[in-house]
Amino acid sequence: MKKVLFTLLVSVLAISACKDDSGEAPAPLDPLAVGEVAELNSSLAYNFSATYCGPCLNPGAQVSRDINTNLGENGYFIKMHPDGSYASIAVTEEATAFETNAWNLAVEAGTAQAGYRSWPSFGVNSELMRGSNFATYTDYITYSGEQASIYRNSPCKANIGSKFMLEGKKLTLKYKLQSFQGLEGRHRIAFYVVENDQNSQQWGLHEGGTDPESLPVIHSPLLIGSLTGTFGEEDINGLSAGEALEGTVEYDLKYMDYDKAPRMGGNYNDVNVEPVLDNLDVFAIIFDGNSSNYKFVNISKAERVTP
């Protein structure tokens, strides 16, 4: 009898603990709720290259991997295929706009040189570069890592914490933009969708040989679109130190259709958007929009939550 009474008592206490003072059970915790945002700078390195370019295996694929490796924990890398890059997969409007903006920033800074808009080229944060800027290959691939280390230890103006969930092709993301040093003037935030495991053949110079049907090359993380436009959709006009801004983004990935983007002909890289769902990441980027072009401020990776 004592055992039965004890069991009943524990059950009553457990039920009571699940109710508030009004006797109602509290609402379930939101799995997408964003907690404290890290006061931390991360860098963005990006590479404009192609798949239909014989000489582009090294600067296109291998360099991408080397740059990504050298970033370490201090930043993130995104491979982009802009219009005119002779890529046969994921030629996106976002990549084209990003390349144009990177070039315009170089012009604005007075560092633009002939050939910068000829792929492949790469950048780190708001700086655009080509291999001709460096004396050796090692200098070339380690530069972004060195810059990322410096930026990591700089004062953090603001950062974004975000979480997303996929139900079918419907993506729901919640975010918190936290200001630490203050964001003066106009800023924007954008959310980029990338595929983190894209294997596609590299025409002319594949890993494993020069035959077009040889082993594929890894093109990852590969930009396939944006949830909020290339540089965001809404202006954030000033955010004082200590202030935060929260929001929700919903997007149906059936509208992304990145595999239908303009591209070179051929059957080397036929892609179905379905497998992307399992290999999908989302990056949140803060941009400074106080000039006619968008300057990089910070980047973070959204946490994926299982429904």
Say what each PLM segment does.
Residues 1-44, 307:
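Bacterial Sec-dependent N-terminal signal peptides
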Residues 11, 38-41, 46, 115, ...:
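A broadly tuned, weak detector of single residues within folded domains
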Residues 15, 50-53, 255:
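Mature extracytoplasmic/luminal segments of secretory-pathway proteins
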Residues 15-18, 67, 203-208:
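General "foldedness" signal
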Residues 33-84:
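Local sequence-structure signature of Cys/Sec-based thiol-disulfide redox active-site neighborhoods
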Residues 79-307:
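Short, conserved sequence motifs used for protein processing/export or organelle targeting and
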